[in-house]
Amino acid sequence: MTERNGGFPGDYCFEAPGGDYDEGSDSPRVSEGSNCSKRKVGETFGVSKMVLPLSGLSSSDRKELIRRLRQELEQIRVFQKNFELSRTVALTSSSASGLTRVKSFGMSRCSTGPGKTVNPISAASKPTPVTTAVMLLMKQCEALLKRLMSHQYGWVFNTPVDVVKLNILDYFNVIEHPMDLGTVKNKLTSGTYSCPSEFAADVRLTFSNAMTYNPPGNDVYVMADTLRKFFEVRWKTLEKKLSGTKVHTEPSNLDAHKEKHIVIPVPMAKKRKTTAVDCENVVDPAKRVMTDEDRLKLGKDLESLTEFPAQLINFLRDHNSNEGGIGDDEIEIDINDLSDHALFQLRDLLDEHLREIQNKKSSVEPCEIELLHGSVPGNSSMQHCDGSELDDEVVDIGENEHPTSSISPVTIEKDLVLGNSNGNSLGSVSGDPKMSSLPRASKGLGTIDLEPMLDGATSASPTRGSSVGGLDQLESASPEKISSVEADCQQDGNSAQNEKQLPPEKSYRAAILKNRFADIILKAREKPLNQNDTRDPEKLQREREELELQKKKEKARLQAEAKAAEEARRKAEAQAAAEAAAEAKRKLELEREAARQALMEMEQSVELNENAKFLEDLELLKTVDTDHLTNTIEEEDGPDVGLRSFSFGGSNPLEQLGLFMKQDEDEEEADPLTSPAPEIDIEEGEID
């Protein structure tokens, strides 16, 4: 009985009595030195056919057979890979007509002279023209395959099934067409697939084989089902793109089928090579293709966004393939699933959003600059600072604003650089800063809205062109608003009263700030005058003289305010220091008094405790039983104890201790009177 395994290359057949044959390997091998007398050699379609009796082979011959067959299989695979590679190169290198004829395997046996019909095998193997869209889809299929193979369950399906290692000898009886992701990758890289549909069919076959052989609930079944769903969700996007390309590919397929039985003369074929032009080859190269680096950069830019605009969210929802696994507040999208056209649209939307963010950041963001501990007031344009003075300034965003203050603080952009260690003035500005101000509501006082560039006449930094001065804008915009310099001059008393209401530290900061930027304010107003060269020179000269006079007055007033604020601050600091010293002294006296009271209470408690102890000892001596006490002392301490010499005898124990009651003098005087008279010896017979 001979059996034939169609899965073996070379069309080998072998005898297996009773249907038993070696399934120890995926592909049997033949050894060159094996002595098989029953070997039969035939030929089918030009391929040799041999029948090998497995029952008559020894173990060494079988091993040699396996080795030989594996070697031949490897040679066939290498040949197939080279053939497919040459076909792919021939397809992509055709530039005249876009139609390339490739000789199939064994085609040299057929002749295609004039009047000869084309061999159906060679006609069927003639490839259809591959367009740019199909090539891009195949690249996306390759990316999807990489994701499948790198999945946590992909390792099970990355290699062919080893029936010997897994001990599943009946696998090829159940599964007629084995397939794995590794084989799919090899076929994809070698160009075997002519369209993405063939790729999808092999991927589905891989998972369906695993689900067919393994029962539901098995680990491999669950893994295959998970990967199948993973693939189907992402294949929907590619399938939509593929449906658009089928319109162009189907006519070429029909022409290929018609050419199977058509007589093709050689001269006509040469004419087609030189004259035929494929319209798709002209249109497709114009399409933009996004590279992998651009895709990666696009993904990083999307991840870096904290807020998404509405148009970007709508675009992502429209192109989202995972419709079932998302919520209202979450969108999951794969960059590799999107087409190049969609990716470029997404890139444009993202660039537009980033430009809007950059414009917002580059716009004027005013912030107040306050001075904690300013230096001596003076001309800011002549003051130079070192690195230590930079610590005296802080930026106040407006949280500690004075609600009723008439002071108009000058605000500067956040990117303003205030001085440096090279000796630039704190009043000067490096680069091209713009001056602006926060609109504040104050009684009868306008604010400064300056946006001119500072030139280098007063400060040490270079400047560029500037706009119209803010004071002129205020005068033209509203007649009720006046310049800050004139308002300060006219309302000196009001500002002084308001500053008195402020804390000394706040007043000092405001005065130093105004004094520091006085030159900048006046210079900003003077610059528009220098730009208006078309005006009357005499009028310009008068305005300059007025500005110089106002500048001198303003400087004098600001210096006086700064000095007054400095003096007030010093007085406040001295008063606060005196109050702090007095408070510390008072606290020290209170602590000392509390310590003395605690010491006295402690001494009194100690004396009372000692007197109570003495009284308890005396009471014990008065109430103790002398006989019992002496007996216990003799038993415990022995005869050498000093207390044994005391004989209590029933007398007062205090007298035994040497304590006696002292009698008063009155009692001593009364003793002779009460004492009995001395006895007189009376002789017998004598009458008294």
Curated annotation (Swiss-Prot):
Main location: nucleus
GO terms under cellular component: nucleus
Disordered: annotated segments: 1-36, 423-505, 660-688
Ranges in a coiled coil: 534-613
Region (Transcription activation domain): 505-688
Biased composition annotated in UniProt, kind: Polar residues: 491-500
Pfam family of the protein (one): Bromodomain
InterPro entries the UniProt entry points to: Bromodomain, Bromodomain-like_sf, Env_Response_Regulator, GTE_bromo, NET_dom, NET_sf
Signal peptide: none
Assembly notes: Interacts with BT1.
Descriptive protein name: Transcription factor GTE9
Organism: Arabidopsis thaliana (Mouse-ear cress)
Gene (name only): GTE9
